[in-house]
């Protein structure tokens, strides 16, 4: 009897790329819901614009490359890229910004390298950074959370602001950004950095309405906890591994704690770092991208720790208030080096 030895792999599972991407999309529902609750309908409009733009851009490039459009679009990677970019930008940013960022992310940051699996950088973060550098004012014009906002735009107003820049009653972004204290609001991280540079004490800064939350910034703490809930669900579904989120959050916490202990008058407390900005979104949904992250367990720990350190450095000493996108891209650069030095030893191989 002749036995045939099949080629590897010898273990199989049902985790196709499309299913993993779908799980990530489903896990994003709590975070999206929280952003809708605290920042209004603009987030939903941005998601729809980004999704359509991502699918059309991907289809166009695939058509030009004479590849199967339907089969590739079914992997859901274009949708995920659009979603991650849409939830990262201000909810009432002009419509052309999310379209431009999404098209750039899909065509330049993904398809130009050969498509899914070939891109060295996270496409959504490339699109975000391009927008942030090109249009810094619009990209930092976040609305105050509803609990401290004076003017809360409805669904129709959100659409009108996104497409025309004004509400039906003639209000603009300057009006919508007013908080209950009559001052234009920014994110907790942006407010802290700007106020410290203006010479305000931390005690004064913590009295601002934006810090009226139980743990950190108003609204933002719940948004981050919602993204955390989605991330925990991804871990439970085994769609991502624990190494990157854990090392990222532990490193960020340690750096923020040490910095705050040594310089409490100039550096933010650890809970502000953990529950403000894109911390949890980055930890569970962006850094864990299987294409652009490290592929070994030790490498994942190093990769996550490096990103956590970079986020704290950029937030504390850099020119941008958040820093997650820049940290992700800088960490992406190091992945080949990290993977090279953390390769597991081949079974049976002895050290020379």
Curated annotation (Swiss-Prot):
InterPro entries recorded: NqrB/RnfD, RnfD_bac
Cofactor needs: FMN
Domain of life per record: Bacteria
Keywords, alphabetical: Cell inner membrane, Cell membrane, Electron transport, Flavoprotein, FMN, Membrane, Phosphoprotein, Translocase, Transmembrane, Transmembrane helix, Transport
Protein's cellular compartments: Cell inner membrane
Annotated transmembrane regions: 20-40, 42-62, 78-109, 123-143, 148-168, 214-234, 242-262, 267-287, 301-321, 322-342
GO biological process: electron transport chain; transmembrane transport
Enzyme type, top EC level: translocase
EC numbers on record: 7.-.-.-
Gene Ontology cellular component terms for the protein in this record: plasma membrane
Family: Belongs to the NqrB/RnfD family.
UniProt-listed PANTHER family: ELECTRON TRANSPORT COMPLEX PROTEIN RNFD (PTHR30578), ION-TRANSLOCATING OXIDOREDUCTASE COMPLEX SUBUNIT D (PTHR30578:SF0)
Quaternary assembly: The complex is composed of six subunits: RsxA, RsxB, RsxC, RsxD, RsxE and RsxG.
Listed name of the protein: Ion-translocating oxidoreductase complex subunit D
Upper taxonomic lineage: Bacteria, Pseudomonadati, Pseudomonadota, Gammaproteobacteria, Enterobacterales
Gene: rsxD
